[in-house]
Amino acid sequence: MSSINYPFVTEKAMMLLDENKLQFIVDTRSNKKQILEDVEKMYGFKVKSVRTMTTMKGMKKAVLAFEEPEAAHEIATRIGLM
């Protein structure tokens, strides 16, 4: 079972693409290691860091930074964000 639910698409999330970062809504029970492994397996890019936070609505949001340049743009294009 994947810990990734869906990409989090806002204006701020689109600006983070320039910093090679993507945001996802994830399962509230998943930890940073599970999120990192799932994203690397799903998209084939190395993740540099994972930051998580819980929104005011009770959802868990993960901000992922990628090691390869332009990895976030490539993933966003694959999943139809761009």
UniProtKB/Swiss-Prot annotation:
Keyword rRNA-binding: yes
Keyword ATP-binding: no
Key words of the record: Ribonucleoprotein, Ribosomal protein, RNA-binding, rRNA-binding
Signal peptide: none
Family label: Belongs to the universal ribosomal protein uL23 family.
UniProt subunit comment: Part of the 50S ribosomal subunit. Contacts protein L29.
Record-linked NCBIfam families: PRK14548.1, uL23_arch
Protein name: Large ribosomal subunit protein uL23
